[in-house]
Amino acid sequence: MTTSTRETRIVADPDVPLVRITREFDAPPSKVFRAHTDPELLVQWLGPRGLQMRIDSFDCRPGGSYRYVHSDANGEYAFRGCFHDVRPDELIVQTFTFEGWPEGVALEKLVLEDLGNGRTRLTATSLVDSFEGRDAFLASGMETGVVEGYERLDEVLAR
């Protein structure tokens, strides 16, 4: 299946507590990878418009960890995790936890596919520990955050 450049597809698997996100970008894998691994770029696009973001720690290497906080007038929303595998321009495997629900840990895998002509297909999967956790994740506004975040990433990649 091929998605259009601006379409973000978010699919919940009916058989396992997994969410799959697919998006294409008008940039080569090296540039998309850097935007995911350089904290100075990441802070410019991750999450929905209207939230401020700060990165408390970010060590993108196998065994490294991260913590970042989104904030708005209603409060702060902190996230953290550990990197398990990082392959430049190809793959990132990490855990992901929303600190407001620390028992809900997801295993995330981000794969970058070179489509040629300076384009990349990103496929991200998040395997959550339960259907309840996955459904709460989806109901949390995650779709808005992902779609708006990738729109913001388009802007960063165009620079």
Predicted features along the sequence, with ranges:
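Hydrophobic ligand-binding cavity/cleft-lining segments
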Residues: 1-52
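Hydrophobic/aromatic beta-strand elements that line small-molecule binding cavities or substrate pockets
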Residues: 22-23, 55-58, 79-85, 96, ...
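Hydrophobic pocket/interface hotspot
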Residues: 32, 42, 66, 83, ...
